[in-house]
C-alpha cells in the first residue's frame, strides 16, 4: 500500500515540503559543533602529542593516556577543554561551508532525470567541498592549535588567548592578517586526503566484509567497515596533519620562521624525532574520528526531525 503524505507536509504543487538550504547548512554546522563539545579533549591530546618532543628524540608524553593524565594533573578538568571556543568556530565555518559547497555541486551535477553523480564525481565533489571548507576554517584552526598547545609551555612563554575571538584579534594585531591562513595548504591537503581515503576505504572495506561470507549488508557490517575506514583515513592523513599543527603553532626565531614549508617539517620530524613520529597522536585522532562523525549525524537527524515537526507538519 502506497504511503500518503500528510496534508501539511506538501506544498501547493503537491511536492513534499523540505527544509530550505540555509536551514540545512545551519543544522550541519550546529551538528558539528555539538559533536565537538564531546570530542574536544581528544583533539587537545592529539595536538599536544604532535608537538611533544618537537626537534628531539625525547617526548613529553609516552602515550596518549599519559598525556591525558598529565594534562588533568597540571591543568585540571577545565584544562582538557582548552580551546573549545576555537573548536566550535572551526566547525561553524568548516562544516557549514563544506556542506554548502557539497550540496550545491551535487545538485548542479545531478542529471535532469534525477540521476545522481557517479562515484568518481562524488569523490571529486567531496574533495572540492572539503578543501574549500578547510580554507574558510583555517583561521579558527590556527587559533585552536595555539590555544590547545599553550598549557604545555612555561607561563612566561604562553600566548594566553582568552577565547577564539581574542586569539584572532591578537594574531591580526601582532602578526598580520596573512598569519590567520598560516598552514592553509596542509589544512586543505588534509581535507582532500580525508575525503578521498574515507570514500575509497569505506566502499572497499564493506565489499571485502560482504565477500568474506561472515557479514550481510546490515548495521554491523557498516560499523566494521567504518572502523576500518577510520583506521585507513587516520594513517593516511596524520603526516599531513602533523605538518599543519607544527606550522600553525610555530614562532619566529630571530625574525625567521621555525619551518620554511611543509616539506621542511616532514624532513625535520623524520631526522630529529624518527620516522614514526609522523603518526604522533594516532590514538586520540582515531578515537575522535568515529565518535565525532556518529554524533554529528545523530544531532543532525534530531534537528531535522524537530524542524519538520515544528514547521513542515500540521
Swiss-Prot record:
Q: Which family does it belong to?
A: Belongs to the mitochondrial carrier (TC 2.A.29) family.
Gene name of the encoded protein: SLC25A11
Keyword terms of this UniProt record:
Acetylation, Antiport, Lipid transport, Membrane, Mitochondrion, Mitochondrion inner membrane, Phosphoprotein, Repeat, Transmembrane, Transmembrane helix, Transport
List the GO biological process terms. gluconeogenesis; lipid transport; malate-aspartate shuttle
Main subcellular location of this protein, as a coarse class? mitochondrion
Where, per UniProt, does this protein localize? Mitochondrion inner membrane
Could you tell me what this protein is called?
Answer: Mitochondrial 2-oxoglutarate/malate carrier protein
Do the record's keywords include Transport?
yes
The Gene Ontology CC terms held by the record are: mitochondrial inner membrane; mitochondrion
InterPro entries per UniProt: Mito_Metabolite_Transporter, Mitochondrial_sb/sol_carrier, Mt_carrier_dom_sf
Q: What does the UniProt function comment say about this protein?
A: Catalyzes the transport of 2-oxoglutarate (alpha-oxoglutarate) across the inner mitochondrial membrane in an electroneutral exchange for malate. Can also exchange 2-oxoglutarate for other dicarboxylic acids such as malonate, succinate, maleate and oxaloacetate, although with lower affinity. Contributes to several metabolic processes, including the malate-aspartate shuttle, the oxoglutarate/isocitrate shuttle, in gluconeogenesis from lactate, and in nitrogen metabolism. Maintains mitochondrial fusion and fission events, and the organization and morphology of cristae.
Residues with PTM Phosphoserine? 6
Residues carrying N6-succinyllysine: 57
Q: How is it modified after translation?
A: The N-terminus is blocked.
Please give the tissue specificity annotation from the record for this chain: Heart, liver and brain.
Where N-acetylalanine occurs, the residues are: 2
Q: Name one GO molecular function term.
A: transmembrane transporter activity
Name the Pfam families on file.
Mito_carr
- Which windows of the sequence hold Solcar repeats? 23-108, 117-208, 217-306
